[in-house]
Amino acid sequence: MSRFVSAALVGAALLVSGNAFAYDAAAGKATYDASCATCHKTGMMGAPKVGDKAAWAPRIAQGMNTLVSKSIKGYKGTKGMMPAKGGNAKLTDAQVGNAVAYMVGQSK
């Protein structure tokens, strides 16, 4: 029983700290190329271009969990919009998170 309680406490601590998810930027490149580059390479619909540090800085400051959540659920802001899962409903949440990690890594 004590192992279960310990595991539950560790899991809860990870969720609260925001580090419950690990993203794989290398795996995210394939998803970016297939599903994200159309907008994030050109700036279509106000999407921040990958590599544009000034455009990405305030987004990165929100934290990965916020960026990934908005990318999964969709978001409409004053500078543009992000359709849920980039408009590709077949993407898994993990694929979206990995693609976001790739874009963030290229934009720091």
Curated annotation (Swiss-Prot):
Keywords: Electron transport, Heme, Iron, Metal-binding, Photosynthesis, Signal, Transport. Heme c binds at residues 36, 39-40, 82. Residues 1-22 form the signal peptide. Pfam families: Cytochrome_CBB3. Binds 1 heme c group covalently per subunit. GO terms for molecular function: electron transfer activity; heme binding; iron ion binding. InterPro entries: Cyt_c-like_dom, Cyt_c-like_dom_sf, Cyt_CIE. One of its GO terms (biological process) is photosynthesis. This basic c-type monoheme cytochrome has been found exclusively in the green photosynthetic bacteria, although its role in bacterial photosynthesis is not established. It has an unusually low redox potential compared with mitochondrial cytochrome c. It is reactive with cytochrome c oxidases but not with reductases. This is Cytochrome c-555. It comes from Chlorobaculum tepidum (strain ATCC 49652 / DSM 12025 / NBRC 103806 / TLS).
